């Protein structure tokens, strides 16, 4: 009886490790994807509402446009491509919408990504998925593009904050 109980306890304790070992690549992608959404949302909350129209040069996107891009293309479309899950209809977003509407939309889009990435399995990463411009890519490629896109746009938002005399979230002391 003692031996059986010990074996069962060992199996229960080891089970999470076995499960994690079955998806090392998708677990790595999920780990990368956990940090950036918070930084991006914090940056969106940090920028004053009256600065959402700010852009460093006429050719660049406004801060509000960056947020809209993240909501629509950067999150719903990319996370859908990476996971194979159909994205919900996000509704309409314009760069001139209120800060509150844009931040709420941004949070909702990241929630979809969190749910989509939670389902991602290594066995699916080589599956083909539709991508921008009618191209086909692998789900793994789409997942990596998503995480890279978040890093790119967070750095963009951080620069916009600094140009307006504000510290980006990752530059603040805890």
Language-model region placement:
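Positively charged n-region of N-terminal signal peptides that target proteins for export
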Residues: 1-5
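Short, flexible helix-adjacent loops and helix caps
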Residues: 48-52, 82, 118, 122-125
């Amino acid at each position: 009886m003692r031996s059986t109980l010990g074996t069962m306890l060992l199996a229960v304790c080891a089970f999470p490790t076995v499960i994690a070992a079955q998806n090392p690549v998708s677990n790595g992608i999920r780990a990368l994807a956990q940090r950036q959404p918070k930084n991006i949302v914090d940056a969106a909350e940090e920028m004053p509402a009256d600065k959402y129209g700010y852009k460093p040069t006429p050719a660049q996107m406004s801060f509000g446009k960056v947020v809209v891009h993240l909501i629509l293309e950067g999150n719903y479309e990319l996370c859908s491509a990476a996971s194979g899950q159909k994205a919900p209809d996000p509704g309409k977003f314009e760069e001139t919408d209120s800060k509150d509407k844009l931040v709420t939309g941004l949070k909702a889009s990241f929630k979809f990504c969190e749910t989509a990435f939670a389902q991602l399995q290594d066995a699916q990463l080589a599956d083909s998925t539709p991508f921008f411009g009618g191209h086909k890519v692998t789900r793994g490629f789409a997942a990596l593009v998503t995480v890279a896109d978040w890093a790119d746009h967070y750095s963009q938002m951080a620069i916009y904050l600094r140009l307006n005399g504000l510290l980006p979230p990752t530059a603040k002391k805890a």
